[in-house]
Amino acid sequence: MAWYDGAIFYHILPGAVSPDGEKKSAFLCMEEQLPYLKVLGIDAVILGPLFSEDPLCYGARDFTGINPRLGTEEEFCHYVERAHSMGVKVILDVAVLFSSRSFFAFQDLLQHKEKSAYRSWYKDVQFTVEGEKEDGFTYAAWKDLADYPLFNFDDEDLRMYIVERIKDWISRFDIDGLRLAHCSCMDIHFQKS
């Protein structure tokens, strides 16, 4: 039987953790809550997206660094170590179905238009129609929200980029698993990779 069969999970949105006016990071505040979660019988925490800087915390600007308003990478690593020392697994909730408009690949698309090396990373990019944001093109967006352009998982380079980021998170942060946000909308072959 796998460790997650019958496990009790607790979902935390780090961006919503309130340090009660103190100058503590979200990770330090969450670390203080670990003993309480252990008493509740929690086996694993699922941490909402850490890599985003948008208000909903799902449209990533950068898939490599932790959002600085949550705390430092060191503080996050310490949180994971402390959780593990208490027998609590750490799962990252990751949103890789789309990016924010400030993500480097979309910024390149805005700047270079048809000549962008990242044009194929996004779904349904069309330069014949003006979009909602008046960029000179349209694109598919998550729930038709133009701030969240959908990735095109048919693109091999994009898939490799995302898989490499995920491998990096697992090795760098010693996390125990992933929850792929919006995976029902995602290519099944990518999910399996």
Features from the language model and the residues they span:
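Active-site and adjacent substrate-binding regions of carbohydrate-active enzymes
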Residues: 1-193
